[in-house]
Curated annotation (Swiss-Prot):
The gene is plc. This is 1-phosphatidylinositol phosphodiesterase. Cleaves glycosylphosphatidylinositol (GPI) and phosphatidylinositol (PI) anchors but not PI phosphates. Potential virulence factor. The active site is at H56, H106. Transmembrane segments: none annotated. It is an enzyme of class 4 (lyase). Gene3D superfamilies: Phosphatidylinositol (PI) phosphodiesterase. Induction: Less protein is secreted in a secG or double secG/secY2 mutant (at protein level). Keywords: Hydrolase, Lipid degradation, Lipid metabolism, Lyase, Secreted, Signal, Transducer, Virulence. One of its GO terms (biological process) is lipid catabolic process. GO terms for cellular component: extracellular region. Residues 1-26 form the signal peptide. CDD domains: PI-PLCc_BcPLC_like (cd08586). One of its GO terms (molecular function) is phosphoric diester hydrolase activity.
Length: 328
């Protein structure tokens, strides 16, 4: 009789413990549905309070040339696949072409598609997953065609941002630090084009975002209402780069100020050989930072911009999943 009671008691404890475990780890499963992970968050959160995985030079997946790929290819998945894998920050860089279009570039290298390709894919994705938000960084990355008569920003504003085909796609609210509820189904602009007449998104002021080259830096944006904290030391070697990434992660972890915007680049410029290619750097940096994020648990990371987003090396944690699951 005593044995039966003991067995019953242990069974009850196991059931209770199991229920507690699954309840306590419910939010760990965000990355199990990467295509709509934002839909499971409190939509009262500001975007700056959400840990967001991003891709660096997001459009470089089109490169096939093996020589150019060593230093210019930073992604191997197309836009829609990146979105489905959980990426929500896209680093789009371009060049103004003679036909008043923006060609997507990585530096001098043309990536064989136009900005409209990204916007069309984002529009399609957000219509399928209307509770998600995409942050799009926009930057001029190469000199305009000699026949261009408008500035890069003017072309973007007139032919894309204000284009009836895309206008409802962009967040156009006045909140400098919008919530997820305000931006669902929208692209929020992260403006690296310089001075602008666009009054919504990050960098929405006359001076734009003042970006320091190859540096960890802080600057005020949106007429001083937000503090942008960036690590973009792309000329570092592995050890120094990892240290720089971890240093900004440590600051974000203990910072509860929603008006601080953390943008942390994991990318390193290639040295031009397979040994120090973007892929090789990513194969070491991504798993190392993923391990750190996992060890930190539910803690603020900010927005982490990575090479080869959605690519998992055998035996290592996937960095996109770890960023998603670190959300509280």
């Amino acid at each position: 009789m005593k044995k039966c009671i003991k067995t019953l008691f242990l069974s009850i404890i196991l059931v209770v413990m199991s229920g507690w475990y699954h309840s306590a780890h419910a939010s760990d499963s965000l990355s199990k549905s990467p295509e709509n992970w934002m839909s499971k968050l409190d939509d009262g959160k500001h975007l700056t309070e959400i840990n967001i995985p991003g891709s660096h030079d997001s459009g470089s997946f089109t490169l096939k040339d093996p020589v150019k790929s060593v230093w210019a290819k930073t992604q191997d998945k197309d836009y829609l696949t990146q979105m489905k894998s959980g990426v929500r920050f896209f680093d789009i860089r371009g060049r103004a072409s003679a036909d008043n279009m923006i060609s997507v570039h990585h530096g001098m290298v043309y990536l064989h598609h136009e900005l409209g390709k990204f916007l069309d894919d984002a529009k399609y994705y957000l219509s399928a997953y209307p509770n998600e938000t995409i942050v799009m960084s926009m930057k001029k990355d190469y000199d305009s065609d000699s026949k261009v008569t408008k500035t890069f920003e003017e072309i973007f504003r007139e032919y894309y941002y204000n284009n009836p085909q895309y206008q409802n796609l962009f967040y156009t609210g006045s909140n400098a630090n919008p919530t997820l509820k305000e931006t669902k189904g929208k692209i929020v602009l992260f403006n690296r084009m310089g001075g602008t007449y666009i009054k919504s998104g990050y960098g929405a002021d006359t001076s734009g975002i003042q970006w320091a080259d190859n540096a960890t830096f802080e600057t005020k944006i949106n007429n001083g209402s937000l503090n942008l904290k960036v690590q973009d030391e792309y000329k570092d070697y592995y050890d120094k780069k990892v240290e720089a990434v971890k240093n900004l992660l440590a600051k974000a972890k203990t910072d509860s100020n929603k008006d601080n915007v953390y943008v942390n680049f994991l990318s390193v410029a290639s040295g031009g050989s397979a040994f120090n290619s973007t892929y090789n750097y990513a194969s070491h940096i991504n798993p190392e930072i993923a391990k750190t994020i996992k060890a930190n648990g539910k803690a603020r990371t900010g927005w982490l911009i990575v090479d080869y987003a959605g690519y998992t090396w055998p035996g290592y944690d996937d960095i996109v999943s770890e960023i998603i699951d670190s959300n509280k």
